[in-house]
Design a protein with these regions (language model features):
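Conserved, mostly hydrophobic/aromatic
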Residues: 128, 135, 144-147, 222, ...
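Substrate-binding cleft of secreted/luminal carbohydrate-active enzymes
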Residues: 261-278, 291-367
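Short, acidic/polar
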Residues: 35-50, 124-135, 245-258, 315-326
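Active-site-adjacent "subsite" loops/lids of carbohydrate-active enzymes
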Residues: 80-139, 156, 187-200
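Bacterial Sec-dependent signal peptides at the C-terminal "C-region" and cleavage site
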Residues: 12-26
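Glycoside hydrolase catalytic-domain groove-lining segments
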Residues: 183-185, 191-315
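Catalytic domains of carbohydrate-active enzymes, especially glycoside hydrolases
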Residues: 33-67, 138-143, 258-264, 329-335
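Aromatic-lined substrate-binding rim segments of carbohydrate-active enzymes
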Residues: 45, 49-100, 206-225
Length: 367
């Protein structure tokens, strides 16, 4: 079993309807079967969610509107809303002081299409809190799924981009205060060199705690306004040793820490984007379940998101079928696919999803 160096030390069945209760997890709750992105694309193409075997949609917050929400509810599906937590592109246009700063004291360049933000920027956090409250004021959601909960980096590519951030004076000041360390150096680059040379382990832990604080604070807002709604987190599905422990070192992600604060973990199992075989989807899901359920008593749900999207390269219908099956294996209690456009543009993939969602059954405990 793989283990995290930072505190990290089960069957899918597509079978006869006669021997099991359809669409139930081992705990007897409904197995989630969804589509991520802008699922209204399916409606515009003439499909109904319920006719495709779906019981959930995972809609980007920018695509959420009353017409879509009402239609989804009328068709009997749950509505989970993606929330772009630390995606900074929009905010940085008018607030350059929130730009993530690298160890040289420079603005860290965009990582491919993504630009993160300084997670300690109080104005940005207040901005995101207002946005979340606005969603919850207007929609009774089944859950909020936090996205981009990581320090500035890019992992949705075969070759990741892994800068060192953020060393702005705000971050180094808060780090020094929070850990009772005296940070030596006059310039940002001098402070960064001192931190990485003398307090690297403490620095990595502090960065992870900053992200966990975001999850806690967003979760508090959600539970205060809609106590029954689930708090989910999308996150990079690397094993702890991948890319020289970059999941923790660079991105600041600790899956066990997330599991302590969220109701649902959704590993982003985009096999083509990450250059992995289809079997990796099932291997990671199994590893994650063993890891988080050993470390914490509360059972956090696992709902993987898998790739149908043709980028990079082509994901064949059979390949899509394989990752759907792998991602639905225990301990998964739900699955979603990316993206809606892939289904509409390739009817074969639509049929793959429909067939799996219509037949999927998870054995009850003891069966």
């Amino acid at each position: 079993m793989r283990a995290f160096p930072f505190l990290l030390i089960i069957l899918f069945s597509v079978s006869n309807l006669s021997c099991q209760t359809p669409n139930q997890t081992k705990e007897g709750t409904e197995f989630i079967k969804g589509v991520y992105g802008n699922p209204a694309t399916l409606l515009k193409a003439g499909y109904r969610f319920d006719s495709l075997g779906m019981n959930a949609v995972f809609v980007r917050s920018i695509s959420l509107n009353p017409d879509f929400y009402n239609t989804a509810k009328e068709q009997g599906v749950k509505v989970f809303v993606e929330f772009p937590t630390l995606n900074g592109k929009e905010y940085l246009k008018d607030h350059p002081d929130a730009w993530p700063i690298n160890e040289k004291g420079e603005q860290s360049p965009p990582a491919d299409w993504f630009i993160g933000i300084c997670p300690t920027h109080e104005g940005f956090k207040a901005y995101r809190e207002r946005q979340l409250r606005e969603i919850l004021d207007n929609y009774a959601v089944d859950g909020i799924f936090l996205d981009y909960v990581h320090w500035h980096a890019q992992f949705e590519t075969t070759e990741p981009i892994l800068p060192e951030t953020c060393f702005c004076n705000r971050c180094t000041g808060k780090f020094g205060e929070g850990t009772q360390q005296k940070i030596q150096g006059e310039s940002i680059s001098e402070k960064a060199t001192f931190i990485l040379s003398h307090h690297d382990k403490t620095w990595r832990k502090w960065r992870s705690e900053i992200l966990n604080g975001w999850i806690e604070d967003m979760g508090s807002i959600l539970k205060k306004q809609q106590p029954e709604a689930k708090l989910g987190v999308f996150y990079c599905s690397w094993f702890p040793e991948d890319y020289d422990s970059a999941l923790y070192r660079n991105l600041g992600i600790d899956p066990v820490g997330i599991a302590e604060r969220a109701d649902v973990l959704s590993p982003m199992l985009f096999h083509h984007m990450k250059g992995r075989p289809t079997a990796w989807v099932g291997e990671y899901t199994d590893w994650l379940g063993k890891t988080i359920h050993i470390e914490k008593p509360k059972k956090t749900l696992i709902w993987p998101i898998v790739q149908a999207h043709n980028n990079p390269g082509i994901v064949s219908p059979d390949e899509f079928r394989q990752v759907m099956i792998e991602g639905s294996k225990s301990p998964s209690s739900g699955i979603m696919m990316f993206s809606d456009h892939s289904l509409v543009s390739e009817p074969e993939k639509m049929e793959v999803m429909k067939k799996i969602y219509s037949e999927i059954e998870i054995e009850k405990e003891g069966h």
